[in-house]
Amino acid sequence: MAGSTSTDSLPPLAVVGLSFKFPEDATSSDAFWQMLLEGRCVSTEFPADRMNIDAHYHPDRNRLDSVSMRGGHFLKENLAAFDAPFFSMSAAEAEAMDPQQRMVLETVYRALENAGLPMEKVARSKTSVIAGSFSDDYFLLQTKDPLDMPKYTAVGTSRNMLANRVSWFFDLLGPSVAVDTACSSSLIALDMTCQSIWSGDAAMGVTIGSNVILTPELTMSLDNLGLLSRDSLSYSFDSRANGYARGEGIGVIVIKRLDSAIRDGDTVRAVIRSSSSNQDGKTPGITQPSKDAQVRLIRDTYKKAGLDMSLTRYFEAHGTGTPIGDPIEARAIGMAFRRYMSPEKPLYV
């Protein structure tokens, strides 16, 4: 995005490294891009090695002891495979560790490698680690029978360890925080990473987003609220919208100031000009977003960056896939950009 309207804007940040594990074969940037080009859907039934979906499925959404969908978007790899000695831990520690933690460690390593940063170069650096996550299914599995609870459950399943274990293993000295804000967890983690660099608390930041589905409890509770799609598909901004489809993934990006990235000869994969967050306040229901809050956030973020809103031609939306959330978000985007759009200059969402 170009075009600045202020000389007082925040110093731009650069994404210098990335790595991720997404559903099915989308485990690299090239594979993910190819999936997008093909418009390929990777929704499948719940894997048999995770849970017996037949034992939990019932088509009647009014039943509170079941789920009304049969699938979602799942990682294809073996979640039990992990090189524990490489990450300085025993087999007993690894066994008690949430697969999210295991894959986060692996993905951070690859993201730093992607950025051209060897471990010895980042060790003892002022690097923040902010992890966003929304689930702790492995904790539920580990604590179902207290008599069989592994010794290392406390550190293996605590959500804070998604960030803290990365900081420990790579010897990073910046802020280390795990955050849960439901669907926005990963983006809030990104916002907090940016703020840590802009505030001077960190010279570089690692942003993490993770989700793994291992038990039916969270899926069941979300389905009870009518938030999940019976079709296991998200029909965002579509008349067929009936909820969202749950999915798995681990994503990591490495961020530093743009001027530092240019000075160090880093590959700049994207530039972040501004980042902000807010809350809806008291809406008609606690899960219902606020159009006015979203409009304010969009405008405030552009203003803080000194960016000209008329130059934006593409906007990536949340796209809840719900009959309530989608219209609110569409109206908010429309209100924020209305004066800058025309048939000749549309805004693609």
Sequence positions of predicted segments:
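Condensing-enzyme catalytic core of the thiolase-fold
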Residues: 2-349
